[in-house]
Amino acid sequence: MNTLPPITVSTADRDRLFAVLDNFKGDSDQIDYLYDELARAQFVEADAMPEDVVTLGSRLRFRNEASGKEHERVLTLPHETQTVSDAISILTPAGAALLGLKVGDEIRWPHQGHFLRLQLLSVSRT
């Protein structure tokens, strides 16, 4: 059984994401996945967001558990990926999976016939 970790999303991020999703033309599987993630999220006001939880604009460090490789990225909206160094779009599988996680959480999901598993190592606000 694959139990997903709880996620917390700010109401500001929720509103920005729904605005993007409602107007996005692209990969419907990825859009559906992000809608599913938002459907299971707990929403809080931005000023009440815990510092160790991933939000849009967060700089985060995570590890791919299969390869052991660590990555440091900034979670962005799709149109921001060209202007932000080390950006990861919220519309990528990893970006959507990391939204709302807290430091120490792991998430595992099926992807192209196998499972991907990421562990969130650190978060800082940019």
Model-assigned labels for residue ranges:
Residues 47, 93, 114:
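Histidine- and aromatic-rich ligand-binding microenvironments
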Residues 94-106:
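Beta-rich strand-turn-strand
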Residues 54-66, 72-74, 103-124:
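FKBP-type peptidyl-prolyl cis-trans isomerase
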Residues 1-53:
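N-terminal intrinsically disordered, low-complexity, charge/repeat-rich segments that act as generic
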Residues 2, 124-126:
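Short, charged, intrinsically disordered terminal tails
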Residues 42, 82-93:
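Short, structured beta-strand/loop micro-motifs enriched in basic residues and often containing a Trp
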